[in-house]
Amino acid sequence: MDPLVLSLVVVVMLGALAPVVGSLQVALAGIHGLRNHLRRSGACLPRTVVVVPAWNEAAVIGASVDRLLAMDYPADRLRVLVVDDCSTDATPDAVLERVVRHPGRVIHLRTSEGGRGKAHALNEGLARALADEWAEAVLIIDADVQFEDGTLRRMTRHLADPRVGAVTGYIKEGSHDPGFLNRFIAWEYLDAQAAARRTQDVLGGLACLAGGAQLHSRANLEALGGRIDTSTLAEDTVTTFETQLAGRRAVFEPAAVVWAEEPPDLHALWKQRIRWGRGNVQVTRRYLSTWFRPWTRRGLSGVLFGLSWFTVLLQPLFMIASAVALLVLLAIRDDVAWVVFRAVWLTHGVCYLFLVLSAFVIDRQVATRCWREGVLFPGLVSVVIIGYAAVQAVTGAWGVSGGHPVAWLLAGWLASCMAVAWLAMRLETARGGRWWSRALLYLAGYGSFLCVVTLAAYVRELRGSDNRWEKTEKRGRALLAS
Amino acid sequence: MSTADTPVPGLVTDPAEVARFAAERDEDSRRERRLFVGQAVMLLAVLVVVAVLVAVQRA
């Protein structure tokens, strides 16, 4: 084959890398059933301080503190420290009411300077918590999350193994009356948390301790200098990496369920994910000497871990490159273009089928509740293209010539779906645009939205935009756990 | 001293509490093993679908 054509074929196939790696990740999650940290866990109830950073969280903070104190954990071994980051709403009143109601169990700490972001507030809280020898473990959470009764016990049991420095739980989208976007997020978390973190546990390297639920042993925090990183937008990921690079394990506990309120609209989600995306770019640069070095250590330096990290990070570029290469192939060798087109989309189809079916095994509750969004996660157009590729491959019917406009549309969809997802976000605030926004997101797919956010995050990083912390607004909507 | 030799704070010796932790661990282990079986079944189901498609195409 002509080297140019061969190169184009390879680039087109990059468009199928993400679903393949995603499926591999979900398949390996099953191994967690045979290989997990449970057998090294034990009866362990350390004296725990829950550090809750709060900036204008009046809508949620009271219920969160009440729920924490009502958890199935010995009352004399649990304290809640709310770090009030100079809130201007009724947050201090809500916390002080709990301080009076639960003497000695709730602490209100007002930071010296507000609005500097979560990491700074956390550091003030950590300094206060660690200054008292009482604390044997510290649980860092978000102000809006709600822990199930047995969640903390299920996390502390792993600290019975002194090699474990930190434990995280399974964050679930928990709006009582979720909109379509919350159902997409719930489905995303099923893959990105319940499945991916199990796989990372199996591979021996965790990518991120969830910001809403990370339990640290005192020894681990002291080894990290008693502070968390403030130089990036991904302080949770940096803490996770530093813990493991210092020789301690970070463990994912799927039975430790934590319910969280996620953004209700695309604009809020965009802001949140830009922060996450930029944080991941910063982490990638910071740990350049860690990636793909399986001979130095397992886990973070492993090939599979690196492959899954970079596939997520580079997926938008792969999709654009794949679409462009396919369009070029269509122009110069349309016979080869159709073969590769079918190969890419059939790979997508097989992975899609596996991911949708697996969801019902990984978390039946979420899968049953959000199956429509799961089926339409890649977008209605992509699902139709998968069906078309399957019919074409099996029967040879519905063929179109290389010069037909439909052929160009099909070939370019992997790139143009991101533009449609971006348009869905832009239309959301336009007059009468909410319906169109929703329709476009179902057409382009939630996955395409995540890709275009990542792309925007690159651009912001390249432009050196401000590392400003943009708070995700919480409305205190009822959660499933309540 | 390696991390493995570090004394563990919070270890519980009360037999009832130890038994409760063990019961929770066993229950969660069983659930994880069910996940392994379920994933294997789903993988098999997808492979069967692919095999059928390939067979139909060749027929």
Language-model regions, residue ranges each:
Chain A
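Cell-envelope/extracellular polymer assembly enzymes that use nucleotide-activated donors
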Residues: 46-49, 79, 238
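Long helical/loop segments within the catalytic core of UDP-sugar-dependent glycosyltransferases
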Residues: 103, 110, 117-136, 149-233, ...
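Membrane-embedded multi-pass helical conduit in multi-pass membrane proteins
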Residues: 40-42, 311-461
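The conserved acidic donor/metal-binding loop of glycosyltransferases
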Residues: 142-146
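N-terminal membrane-anchoring/stem segments of glycan-assembly enzymes
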Residues: 1-44, 424-428, 442, 446-463
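Acidic helix N-cap motif at the loop->helix transition within catalytic regions
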Residues: 62, 89-98, 118, 150
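A conserved acidic beta->alpha catalytic loop
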Residues: 75, 84-93, 112-115
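Short, acidic, metal-binding catalytic loop of nucleotide-sugar glycosyltransferases
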Residues: 66-77
